[in-house]
């Protein structure tokens, strides 16, 4: 489970507007002209700053901020939270309604388990009035113990709930969403890592609403690519798996069973299974990584065909977890957004409160998915017209 990775699913598309993490996709197979058309189309939509800028601060708050942003080696004191990371206390009717509904259906959310800082905005509906919560599949207990993640752990969590696929699909159907994001805990105690359970949930969601777009943030399944294949062939639209951090820090940040190269192999295999599948990953900043290491990680991700990249600030969930080494400024996050676009990601979502599925991401991905569907329909109609001509001849 991840913070940036698992940190939530959120605000989704309703009538073409929605919300969660601004991502995008760049398939190396995409031709230049279609790519430009997509970018032009997105220009008319909401900008990244419309979604992720915290209304409680302005640019002067961080350009004039004189607080300490980085812990030096050997220092034990925790850094004070800078103004751009402070969020409102969650409340309101929408927030309470979603919380009650999730409890009634016995569904877990990564929003709560991972202590996401955006929970009030997403559950409350935010500026655009669309609300949702990231459904965390396979229970609320993970078999891994990553040092950044607050999801509880156990060697053998409770058995899977056979009603979860149906309950999840029913909740999503009642929200009337066009785009939904799922995530899950790791279940190393299961022979298939839970891949068939995840696939069954996706199929049930699609059965109840064939027009909905589904994104799933899935585990690495211990590197078992057959399990990856099960999820990739379930009818999924966007397959996400998080790299989490740079290679040098992976052994200290993630569970020992989660390896950097293994995650790259998972992301590579998704494209080999289905070249048109949109892939997505996330990186946490503030754990002590260098600019050179971030740059190399981004290049590694492009080399395996990753389409969407998100970068966000690591925030220590409890005193038992890794301390923040550095609070990265919004200006630096903007630099990585620009660099990601230069490296070929169709869109890079980069900001202090960005999580793997936060705010405007679904808008951009939905635009591309709809564009692809329209292109496929036009090709089909053109082929049908050609067949008619041939028959007449």
Swiss-Prot record:
Pathway: Protein modification; protein lipoylation via endogenous pathway; protein N(6)-(lipoyl)lysine from octanoyl-[acyl-carrier-protein]: step 2/2
Coiled-coil segments on the chain, per record: none
GO CC annotations, alphabetized: mitochondrion
InterPro entries from the UniProt entry: Aldolase_TIM, Elp3/MiaA/NifB-like_rSAM, LIAS_N, Lipoyl_synth, rSAM
Subcellular location: Mitochondrion
Record EC number: 2.8.1.8
Obligatory cofactor(s): [4Fe-4S] cluster
Catalytic activity: [[Fe-S] cluster scaffold protein carrying a second [4Fe-4S](2+) cluster] + N(6)-octanoyl-L-lysyl-[protein] + 2 oxidized [2Fe-2S]-[ferredoxin] + 2 S-adenosyl-L-methionine + 4 H(+) = [[Fe-S] cluster scaffold protein] + N(6)-[(R)-dihydrolipoyl]-L-lysyl-[protein] + 4 Fe(3+) + 2 hydrogen sulfide + 2 5'-deoxyadenosine + 2 L-methionine + 2 reduced [2Fe-2S]-[ferredoxin]
Cofactor-binding details, from the entry: Binds 2 [4Fe-4S] clusters per subunit. One cluster is coordinated with 3 cysteines and an exchangeable S-adenosyl-L-methionine.
Keywords carried by this UniProt record: 4Fe-4S, Iron, Iron-sulfur, Metal-binding, Mitochondrion, S-adenosyl-L-methionine, Transferase
Radical SAM core domain ranges (all copies): 127-346
GO molecular function annotations of the record: 4 iron, 4 sulfur cluster binding; lipoate synthase activity; metal ion binding
Residue sites binding [4Fe-4S] cluster 1 per the record: 111, 116, 122, 357
Record family assignment: Belongs to the radical SAM superfamily. Lipoyl synthase family.
HAMAP family to which the protein is assigned, alphabetical: Lipoyl_synth (MF_00206)
Other facts: This protein may be expected to contain an N-terminal transit peptide but none has been predicted.
PANTHER family assigned to the protein according to its UniProt record, in alphabetical order: LIPOYL SYNTHASE (PTHR10949), LIPOYL SYNTHASE, MITOCHONDRIAL (PTHR10949:SF0)
Entry protein name: Lipoyl synthase, mitochondrial
């Amino acid at each position: 489970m991840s913070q940036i990775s698992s940190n939530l699913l959120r605000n989704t598309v309703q009538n073409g507007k929605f919300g969660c993490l601004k991502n995008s996709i760049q398939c190396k197979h995409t031709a230049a002209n279609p790519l430009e058309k997509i970018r032009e189309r997105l220009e008319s939509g909401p900008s990244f700053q419309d979604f992720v800028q915290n209304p409680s601060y302005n640019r002067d708050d961080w350009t004039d901020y004189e607080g300490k942003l980085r812990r030096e080696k050997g220092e034990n004191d925790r850094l004070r939270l800078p103004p751009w990371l402070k969020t409102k206390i969650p409340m309101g009717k929408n927030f309470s309604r979603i919380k009650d509904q999730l409890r009634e259906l016995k569904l877990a959310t990564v929003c709560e388990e991972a202590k996401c800082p955006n929970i009030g905005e997403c559950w409350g509906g935010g500026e655009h009035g669309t609300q949702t919560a990231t459904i965390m599949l396979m229970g609320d207990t993970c078999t891994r113990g990553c040092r950044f993640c607050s999801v509880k752990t156990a060697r053998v969590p409770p058995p899977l709930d056979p009603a979860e696929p149906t309950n999840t699909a029913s909740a999503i159907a009642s929200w009337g969403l066009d785009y939904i994001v799922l995530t899950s805990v790791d279940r190393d105690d299961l022979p298939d890592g839970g891949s068939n359970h995840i696939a069954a949930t996706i199929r049930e969601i699609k059965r109840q609403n064939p027009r909905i777009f589904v994104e799933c943030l899935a585990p690495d399944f211990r590197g078992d690519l057959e399990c990856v294949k099960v999820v990739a062939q379930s009818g999924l639209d966007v397959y996400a798996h998080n790299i989490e951090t740079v290679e040098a820090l992976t052994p200290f940040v993630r569970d020992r069973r989660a390896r950097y190269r293994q995650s790259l192999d998972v992301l590579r295999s998704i494209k080999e299974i289905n070249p048109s599948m949109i892939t997505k990953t996330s990186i946490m900043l503030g754990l002590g990584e260098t600019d050179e290491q971030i740059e190399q990680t981004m290049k590694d991700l492009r080399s395996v065909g990753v389409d969407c990249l998100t970068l966000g600030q690591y925030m220590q969930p409890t005193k038992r977890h890794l301390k923040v080494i550095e609070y990265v400024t919004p200006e630096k996050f903007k630099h990585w957004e620009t660099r990601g676009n230069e490296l070929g990601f169709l869109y890079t979502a980069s900001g202090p409160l960005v999580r793997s599925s936060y705010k405007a991401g679904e808008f951009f991905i939905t635009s591309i998915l709809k564009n692809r569907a329209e292109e496929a329909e036009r090709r089909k109609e053109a082929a049908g017209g050609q067949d008619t001509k041939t028959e007449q001849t």
